[in-house]
Curated annotation (Swiss-Prot):
Transmembrane segments: none annotated. This is Type VI secretion system sheath protein TssC1. It comes from Pseudomonas aeruginosa (strain ATCC 15692 / DSM 22644 / CIP 104116 / JCM 14847 / LMG 12228 / 1C / PRS 101 / PAO1). The C-terminal region is required for cogwheel and tubule formation. Disruption phenotype: Deletion mutant shows a clear reduction in E. coli killing and a lack of ability to secrete Hcp1, VgrG1a as well as Tse3. Forms a heterodimer with TssB1. Heterodimers assemble to form the sheath of the T6SS machinery. Interacts with TssA1. It comes from the Bacteria.
Amino acid sequence: MAELSTENLAQGQTTTEQTSEFASLLLQEFKPKTERAREAVETAVRTLAEHALEQTSLISNDAIKSIESIIAALDAKLTAQVNLIMHHADFQQLESAWRGLHYLVNNTETDEQLKIRVLNISKPELHKTLKKFKGTTWDQSPIFKKLYEEEYGQFGGEPYGCLVGDYYFDQSPPDVELLGEMAKISAAMHAPFISAASPTVMGMGSWQELSNPRDLTKIFTTPEYAGWRSLRESEDSRYIGLTMPRFLARLPYGAKTDPVEEFAFEEETDGADSSKYAWANSAYAMAVNINRSFKLYGWCSRIRGVESGGEVQGLPAHTFPTDDGGVDMKCPTEIAISDRREAELAKNGFMPLLHKKNTDFAAFIGAQSLQKPAEYDDPDATANANLAARLPYLFATCRFAHYLKCIVRDKIGSFKEKDEMQRWLQDWILNYVDGDPAHSTETTKAQHPLAAAEVVVEEVEGNPGYYNSKFFLRPHYQLEGLTVSLRLVSKLPSAKEA
């Protein structure tokens, strides 16, 4: 017992000596001018040492090593506390929003023609505001006035080309109602609304479960999706685009990934568990593609495909050790989606972001809107419905609508007969028609999005000076798929004909 007391006493004396040495170093640095300030420094050092060395022993009598051990203990405690903060759901949601916006702004080359405006409004606030103006008063809501009347509805205004919502939607009645109201506003202002789908839209807890269902289409045939199906069949739903899944916003913090200068922080991330990673809404990635296409070509037509504007490059690539001793890479898009599943998702109105295996590259293969294209007895009518439900074609049509309203507004009051107006509009629209679509390059087709166009102007009976106009626009078709048949033959078909 006496020996134990002697050891404790010796350890206490050593601790006091090390604390005094550390205090003397700080006194030389701070140089307190009063005795009270000197005592404050010594008290702070003593308290710090007691907390840091609680339930521990000094490494040696070396003051430097003792200080390093104190710092290491503090770093460990700070790491545990910061991990709890950063992995809290509220903090993750906040970081996701800022990281996504940062990604959009940093990857967009803005100028006087391409601008980004941010409206800070939460999803519940947006729904609450629009819900007050349902029915015939939908165009009286402050959201409609802010987005439509202040720009597209104003002389000299600059209409929005696209709306991006950092939200996640599913088949719940409030979400279906909100999407329906946003579809009305987007259709009126001719600006598609791009947001994201939640995994709960398919009854999943996360996108990690996407490969489990055998048939995705069957999920949407149940009674609880009645409102969702009705929304997809509406005319205005073609202005809604829902992306999925999320993409990795940053690498985890750590000495080997993204060092923190302030202290030795190691972010705790389980490679197999996606909940501790920082994810961003993939609607931002689609928005970057839309902005890039507009910047390069003046039109938002090249926004999909690996080689035609749909690529998402430079995603964070995080590798981690596996249980079997190997090294694996965290999928930067939550889950790898197969070609067959991508086709199913596009058929059901989603825009999946596909990751290229073992790379930092992903791409939007399709750009299908939420709308389910109608099927008619006339094949041409069905083909027109399919075109109208795809965003690259819709963006071009919306841009023409923006220009036409400004053009007609400027012509009001001038002396224009029907034939003269039709001829003038026809000449104007031909500026955006590719003269030789069969031999034009991809760049030329992107700059001239139409393969053919025709304008018809008709007089309104009983109302002189008023005309009805119809624009028939035939865009360049984009490759949707190719069925390949391989056959071994003794002679080629061309050789037989010869």
